[in-house]
């Protein structure tokens, strides 16, 4: 892999890689090996015409959120916010994560259950949108800003200070997100 400062190559190199995978009709899924900052720098330059004719899965999380939201809002294409190959060998990443991802990629229903930290007596359902809160926040006001009306907004973040999270959530609330 090439490097360019904090990036996995120059913007044009990374754009060429994602474009090649997007255009190739033999590629049925793109598994991002890691999050890595920089997708938001190129996401609006990806030519999505081939993808609209031949949809495929894009899988990843963290900074890949910008790609997920762009695909969803601009193309109406679903993607999968899921574990990346870099983490498959991590003992904290159970085989269940991988198996569930494969089921989702095959089109099988994958129910999501969650035990809230306190007792709750309600059931929710709806379209799920979201991802890394820093990326959601940075895409506010762009064509990739998620539609949250009637949706279940999920957010993830690692190591962010509470006051940063509060600032982002407050801004998102004030802008109607």
Describe the predicted segments one by one:
Residues 144-177:
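Internal helical hairpin/lid segments
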